Amino acid sequence: MGLAAPRKRTKISHDPNNTNWARSTSGFGHKILSSQGWTPGSFLGARDAAHADMFTAASAGHIRVVVKDDTLGLGARAGRDPNEPTGLDAFKGLLGRLNGKSDAELAADQRKADDIKLARYAAFKWQAVRFVSGGLLAQEKLERLPERESVQQSRAAVETSDSNRNSENDASKVSKKKKKKTSSDSSSDEQSSRSEKRREKKEKKDKKEKKEKKDKKDKKRKRAEEDNDASQKSASETPAPEKESTGLESDSTSVSVVKASRERRPLGRQIVRGRHIAQKKRALMDDKSLNEIFMVKA
């Protein structure tokens, strides 16, 4: 911000790396873990666990906790890491040249950094499925006791004897069932023949009812068409009334009367206005009245 920015005084604490809590042996956590058999530098959990071979040196390290200070959802990644230093690649290249690294080594390092940047950009631009390791599900070995094996053998012997008895009983039951089936088959055939006859009768009855309904509808439709035709013929046969007209005055008055009859007659308070407009139309269509209006002698 420069000299105009507010001055902030920061004081470096005695424990900048925050490691005193991990090294202290007087805390509650250290005491309770040591009481349960844990020693500094050893792993957490049972020593003879099924996944004990998978432990590495990183398993004994501290667990890093990152505080979530954004509004993104769980699992979402920001476009850029806020803690990432800018220009670190160029600074590393400069330090490499000062330390005497060759140009080939520097080019290889730069290529690796570029590949990492491209991979990050592709993962951010085109989201892909990420598989997170959830640990190992290892089952402990179960050793069978000899007593259980002897009990199982005795149970198996009892079951074989019971199965032999059941097989004899099943054979006798099967013979009885066969006899019953022969008698039941004959009765079922009779019932099926009766049901088929009933079904055929019902289908015939339904078809007959549908046909009667259809005939009734056709008759009604024909009657309606005949009535419409008769009404149209009667309307066409009635002669239209004609009036005899003499001279130009009678022709103009007849035309105006026909037009006025075809127009829609207003209702209510508009009757007076409609009459006035009709009178104007008649006066304009009559030559004599126009001459009187304009005071012209014919």
UniProtKB/Swiss-Prot annotation:
Function: Involved in rRNA-processing at A0, A1 and A2 sites and negatively regulates telomerase.
GO molecular function, a single term: nucleic acid binding
Subcellular location, record wording: Nucleus, Nucleolus
Top-level taxon in the UniProt lineage: Eukaryota
UniProt KW keywords: Nucleus, Ribosome biogenesis, rRNA processing
Start and end residues of each stretch annotated as Disordered: 1-23, 145-274
GO biological process: rRNA processing
GO cellular component labels: nucleolus
Positions with biased composition (Polar residues): 151-164, 247-256
Comp. bias intervals (Basic residues): 1-11, 199-222
Name assigned to this protein: Protein pxr1
Primary localization: nucleus
Residues in G-patch domain copies: 25-79
Family: Belongs to the PINX1 family.
Record lineage: Eukaryota, Fungi, Dikarya, Ascomycota, Pezizomycotina
